[in-house]
Amino acid sequence: ASDVYKRQVQGQPGSEMIAIENPENVAKHWEDLGAENLHIIDLDGTIDGKTSLDVIKKILKEVSVPIQLGGGIRSIDYAKRLLDLDIERLIIGTMGIEHPETITQLSDEYGSERIMISLDSKDNRVVIKGWQEKIDKSPAELSNEFKEHGAGSILFTNVDVEGLLGGFYTEPVIELKNSVDLPIVYSGGITSISDVKQLNESGVEGIVIGSALYKDKIDLKEALKYQNR
């Protein structure tokens, strides 16, 4: 995972920052190590409302593996602009939750398999707007609603543990997996190879590893050995 902010790879809001120049080189590095998908979040768009579209285009030119991209998507026109760049999946958070009809429109035009809804969870309630606002629905409730609107997959982030390198909680993942018939990609608190193995056994489609890779807590090649076991 790479979070792009001010043309650098950075950490999550509120966590310790890891600044690395040239995001496109970082993306290429992970591809060269065997990553089969890349997870890119535009923190410029999320935090400042000013997108890093130029950096995103450079990354797309540099790598050949599929990319799922999110962050700062506040209009359906911008969403279409990103989908037209041939990213594999577009991750939509706040806009989709506040305006679910946009999910239906994008799904109808581009295919549900390219539309991923981002559900960030704190205390089993979904949070939006950069984790600043909590809504009174659980991830399981919203997942089923968005399946009806045409979302093709779920990115589930446990905000309680994201970026803290303290491990993850199994229960929220299992609850969501048992509640909705959609592919789930999990993010948040993945710290060790043991976490990778446990999540793979839970049946999620994929996992997002960020801080643990940059801080050498997890070796990517070792983690990939547990893929689809």
Residue spans of the language-model regions?
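Short, small-residue-biased leader/transition segments that mark boundaries at the very start
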Residues: 1-5
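Structural preference for beta-strand elements that scaffold enzyme active sites
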Residues: 37, 64-68, 88-91, 114-118, ...
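Glycine-rich, proline-tolerant flexible connector loops at the mouths of alpha/beta enzymes
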Residues: 37-54, 156-166
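Glycine/small-residue-rich loop that forms an oxyanion/phosphate-binding "nest" at active or ligand-binding sites
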Residues: 44, 51-108
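Alpha-helix-loop-beta-strand connector modules within alpha/beta enzyme cores
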Residues: 48-68, 105-119, 165-192
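Catalytic cores of alpha/beta
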Residues: 67-86, 173-206
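C-terminal helical cap(s) of enzyme catalytic domains, especially alpha/beta-barrels
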Residues: 103-110, 200-201, 206-209, 213-229
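Anionic-ligand binding region
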Residues: 105-106, 113-115, 119-152
